Amino acid sequence: MAAPMFSIIIPTLNVAAVLPACLDSIARQTCGDFELVLVDGGSTDETLDIANIFAPNLGERLIIHRDTDQGVYDAMNRGVDLATGTWLLFLGADDSLYEADTLARVAAFIGEHEPSDLVYGDVIMRSTNFRWGGAFDLDRLLFKRNICHQAIFYRRGLFGTIGPYNLRYRVLADWDFNIRCFSNPALVTRYMHVVVASYNEFGGLSNTIVDKEFLKRLPMSTRLGIRLVIVLVRRWPKVISRAMVMRTVISWRRRR
């Protein structure tokens, strides 16, 4: 089978209750140029049975890897190693692609916006139906919050250039990875006005566990939620914003 355009990577562990809706949203895509990489950490429920129900429909496009891992980011790194697609998307088992033509719309955007290394859109928060996203830059990543990773398509080669997810961060390694991407001036990042996923905002580890190792590396303003820095940056961007961002980026690179 020729290498697909997209690899959709889903880490799983005892997710039988939510996995069917996720897999159904993938199987019904009008764009079939994808593979599904399911990385299971040793489920003891019906997770793998459910995945195999979709095997006749997906055929060779379904890759199932089962082994113990060191957490979700270790599973995601393994998914990257297994993937053959040009572009990688990571979904939680309790998330789903938003529309049947989502991949088709993303493929069209990428085709019209070359070169690109990272393209991202928006998500719909499932509990409130709120659309979250918009365009990001390094300032927004450092001083406000992260892009929802269910909305990001990474060129696979980035994981060779930038490196894998850092396993010392238990729940926010994707934020660290995005900062590394956005702080690299050689990479091209693009925002697309497309809703990529329906996102279960209460299902992630970041809502239940504090990643102290990662948070202590963020700017003080981000950690404490102080908005004064943002006001100062907006009023005197050339004096404050660039200096603060560069100090943070230099620190990030030195401490990787």
From Swiss-Prot:
Keywords: Glycosyltransferase, Transferase. Pfam families: Glycos_transf_2. GO terms for biological process: glycolipid biosynthetic process. SUPFAM superfamilies: Nucleotide-diphospho-sugar transferases. It comes from the Bacteria. GO terms for cellular component: membrane. Its EC number is 2.4.1.-. GO terms for molecular function: glycosyltransferase activity; hexosyltransferase activity. It is an enzyme of class 2 (transferase). Involved in glycosylation steps downstream of mono-O-methyl-glycosyl-p-hydroxybenzoic acid derivative (p-HBAD I) and 2-O-methyl-rhamnosyl-phenolphthiocerol dimycocerosate (mycoside B) during the p-hydroxybenzoic acid derivatives (p-HBAD) and glycosylated phenolphthiocerol dimycocerosates (PGL) biosynthesis. Was identified as a high-confidence drug target. Belongs to the glycosyltransferase 2 family. This is PGL/p-HBAD biosynthesis glycosyltransferase Rv2957. It comes from Mycobacterium tuberculosis (strain ATCC 25618 / H37Rv).
